[in-house]
C-alpha cells in the first residue's frame, strides 16, 4: 500500500507564547512516502532532537535496514535538516540507514535580508553529510521529474534566479517546491516557501497545479501564502507541520485578520480534511 506519513515533530508540541515579541517557535517538518514496493522518499525530518524518532519511523516502514532512495531537503534551516544532520554525524544512527541520494539546491548567490549568504555554509555542511552517509548529491533542475517505483517527483521550483528573492527574507525563500504523483493521489510540497515563490510557480504552471494533498508553506503561518496558488491546487487534504502555539496564534485575533492568514484559512476551509502535525503522526493512503 502506498502511503504518506506526516511525522509529529517534538517542537510541534510547543504550547507557549507565540508573537512578535517572543518570536515564532520553529515547529519542524518531516514526511515519508512509502511506494507500492516499499521504496522510501523522505522529505526533511525535523530538528536534531527528532533524529532518533524519525529514523525509527523510517525503519518501521522498511523490510530490514531501510534504504532511502531520495532524501529531499527543502531548505537549510535546522528544523528541516537538523534530523538528517544529526543522523549523518552520529555513527550509530548513520549505520542504521542507507541513503542513496540527497536532493537539495542551495544557490550561493542568494543574499538574505540581513546581507548574509547563509547558503555558502549550508553547502559546505551538506558536503560533510554526503561524505558521512555515502549518498550522492542530486541538485534538481526546473521542471525535472524523478521516478521512484510507483511515485514521480516533479520539481516545480528552485531559486533559479535569485534576483527576484534577494533581500526579502531568509533562506525560507530558497525552498524547493515539488509534487509527488503516487498511484491515486498527488501531493504538493512547499517547504517554507515565500509568497513570491508561490507566485512564480503559479505563473509557470497555472492550471496544472491541481493536487489532492497540499502541505501549507512555512508551518501554516501568516507570513506566507498565495490565494491564487491555493485555488489552483484545490486540495481536498491539507497538511500543516505546525505547533500548538503557532496554530492557536494564527487563528486568534492577533493574526487571523492578516491577508495571508485569510488565504491560509481559505485552503483549510476548502479542504475536506486538515492534518496538523502536533495532533500526532498520521498515515494517509495514497
Feature names for model-found ranges:
Residues 27, 48-50, 76-82, 108-112, ...:
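Active-site environment of divalent metal-dependent phosphoester hydrolases
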Residues 38-39, 49-104, 204-221, 234-239:
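Active-site metal-binding motif and surrounding structural segment of the metallo-beta-lactamase
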Residues 50-54, 80-83, 121-129, 189, ...:
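Stable alpha-helical elements in mature extracytoplasmic
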Residues 1-66, 138-210, 281-286:
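Core dinuclear metal-dependent hydrolase active-site scaffold
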Residues 44, 190, 216-218, 241:
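Thr-Gly-centered strand-to-loop micro-motif
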Residues 9, 96-103, 107-172, 200-201, ...:
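Binuclear metal-ion centers of metallo-dependent hydrolases, dominated by the metallo-beta-lactamase
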